[in-house]
């Protein structure tokens, strides 16, 4: 299992880098550390949703932990449950 620390800002300016880093972890279980996230924008959310779908389709686990309060607050504002951004993989 690989752990990847997300940047403090997941927005237009940082989206390409985040996407590249996440794609580089394809094919293995992944933990995204969102503990330092201070801003989650719509594009950052889209990248995380796409990653969750890719990991689910591959039968791999994708977990987001730890999470900052700002990250959790953004999910509430977007109206999405954390489960939409994670994958349990195949047991």
Regions found by a protein language model. Name each.
Residues 1-43, 47-91:
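STAS-like cytosolic regulatory interaction modules
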